[in-house]
Amino acid sequence: GMTGVVLGASRPDGRLDEWMLSALIAEAEGMDITLHRCFDLTPDKAAALETAIDLGFSRILTSGGATRAPDAAETLATLIAQAGPRITIMPGAGISPATLPALAHLPLREVHASCSMAQPVTDAVAAMGFGPPERRITDETTVRALCAALARL
């Protein structure tokens, strides 16, 4: 079975929807629970972090509120310091072997990266306009390079 899930729910103003998240977490009882990047839309990340802890999340997947996590290294540092050992801050979005050095000064425990590359779609569905002209696939070379870069941190 599954050992973990990634969940998220926001209110119209961007705050975490505590009621919905509580209900989802109850359904995921016994699993490792990660708060997804809806966290990046919250107007007060410090308060949202405390809410995530109170709700029982074990980690927060976040770009630090930026399009790419490496562009928000200082925000991530602040979140990691606030979190301490209570919850893991897992940077994600724009993580690659080339961008990892921007986060090297952080006490990271985990990162999230797609390690993907664009691949053209050549089937009839795409040709007829029923799908995107390309898809993203995991690139083994990028995965290996990221693992090597992480080992050097």
Task: Please describe what each predicted stretch is.
Residues 1-4, 24-31, 52-55, 97-100:
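Short charge-dense sequence patches
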Residues 1-12, 57-72, 106-134:
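Glycine-rich phosphate-binding active-site loops on the catalytic face of alpha/beta enzymes
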Residues 29, 50, 54, 65-66, ...:
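Hydrophobic/basic alpha-helical segments enriched in Actinobacteria
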